[in-house]
Amino acid sequence: MGGLEKKKYERGSATNYITRNKARKKLQLSLPDFRRLCILKGIYPHEPKHKKKVNKGSTAPRTFYLLKDIKFLLHEPIVGKFREYKVFVRRLRKAYGKREWDAVDRIRDNKPAYKLDHIIKERYPTFIDAVRDLDDALSMCFLFSTFPRTGKCHVQTIQLCRRLSVEFLNYVIASRSLRKVFLSIKGIYYQADILGQTVTWITPYAFSHDHPTDVDYRVMATFTEFYTTLLGFVNFRLYQTLNLQYPPKLDYFSEADLKSDNEDKYALETEAYMEKLAALSASLSRVIPSEPEEENEVDEFPADPENAGQEEEQKKQLQEEEKHKSMFVGLKFFLNREVPRDALAFIIRSFGGEVSWDASVCIGATYNSANPSITHHIVDRPSIQTQIINRYYLQPQWVFDCVNARMLLPVEDYFPGVLLPPHLSPFVQEKEGDYIPPEKLRLMALQKGENPEDDDDDDEEDDEDEEEDDEDEDDEENEEEEEDKKLRHLENKKVGQNKLNVRITAGKVKVEDRTQAAEQEKTEEKRLAIMMMKKKEKYLYNKIMFGKKRKVREANKLALKRKAHDESVKVERKKKAKKH
């Protein structure tokens, strides 16, 4: 009494997926256009659980998409624009072939264009969703903004990425939302806290580009097209939250400070204003002029005895956050021409410091190197011939390490020509059992307010004691030999004279150690619990314990390596000291 029997592969998972070629034919698009549409709409291929069933018994490698995603793409208005663009190219080619130049101009003026606004609203229903997804957008825009003007990508795209990335950096400076910085081989990693969301991006170093041949720039350009639209929306909303004008404009007083007679030498009139914004040395103008900022005070409510500790901890955390934001307030920096100006200017301004450089390096210098109010001079040279007394001359790493340490570090380790301490990653969070390098322990001691120099002095004293012990070893050995001879002589005399003395003493009550007994009881309970486990649970438990033990072994191995390295350094130091 049942219905018609369905054929094989006409039900179940086989009907939920569709191959890429079938999807492309259904949408009537070429492969590049289909790929472009999927990138813009956020449609990705899926790997079926039972690939052979979906592939109708075949084992040939194929790309599969969900059928519901392809049906969703059928109603996309951009698909029609892609078809219009095909017709546009065909008509333009035909007009070129006939040498009808008036027709060429007319067709070019009517080039089909589309907007991605509706896709942005569709993919990100709320503004926080868009902020949460900024990581890749920022990394791609910062990468494209550094590209040279070659045939690999459009000049307009490069200029747009440059403008949007500069706008975003100015927002981070105005909101003081930067939290972490790390110099890696790939580039400079930044992490900011934007509206409660953690945003991490990477910017490449300012080196000349050698475009690799194995990279598909069309795919990258499609991603960039979407990301620039997204970043434009986000920048506009972020500027509104801070009451800043958008597009950004320099403050009247800041603009007056940045005016120089030699602007024409560095940039054209059309580019000079953008270069001033990109210098990041001036503040932005607001829609309503801001009043002098007052210190934000935390609201105090009647104390709740249950959550008193938690409230106190939150209050302390907020105070530390505010202190971190204003770490460089009151400090004036001057950057030498050999240091990475863009990164340092951005970081210093993000924490409330003032920064400038030589006027011949770039537009945007606010004071020169002779200014007596400069507190820190950032240089990257082994030695400086003429130094001014009332300022510190430091290597650039000091700025980056201060940001990650959330405090101003001692300057002695960063003087010009000094061997720098290791640049530790702020993104690594050590857990229980992990290896912690001595430099990190020293930094943690500094953050707690302790003085790690005392430990260093103790180590030096130990080294000196070891040296003295090495010198006195020979004398001690001779004295020990003489004492041994005397003892043997006395023992020979006393042989036979000693008698066995037996004493009876009162017994003592052995006091039971309660903590030790509790520990023994706990270990016994744990052992019994392990015995009562099921086979599957026991296997999982053993796996977890094996992982923990392996972690401890690796940490011990690293500690031994570090100890051997430190000992070899000490030996070399002693050899050098003896030579001198």
Swiss-Prot record:
It is found in: Nucleus, Nucleolus; Nucleus, Nucleoplasm. GO terms for molecular function: ribonucleoprotein complex binding. Residues 291-303, 452-483 have a biased composition (Acidic residues). Residues 291-321, 448-496 are annotated as: Disordered. GO terms for biological process: maturation of 5.8S rRNA from tricistronic rRNA transcript (SSU-rRNA, 5.8S rRNA, LSU-rRNA); maturation of LSU-rRNA from tricistronic rRNA transcript (SSU-rRNA, 5.8S rRNA, LSU-rRNA); regulation of cell cycle. Keywords: Nucleus, Ribosome biogenesis, rRNA processing. This is Pescadillo homolog. The gene is pes1.
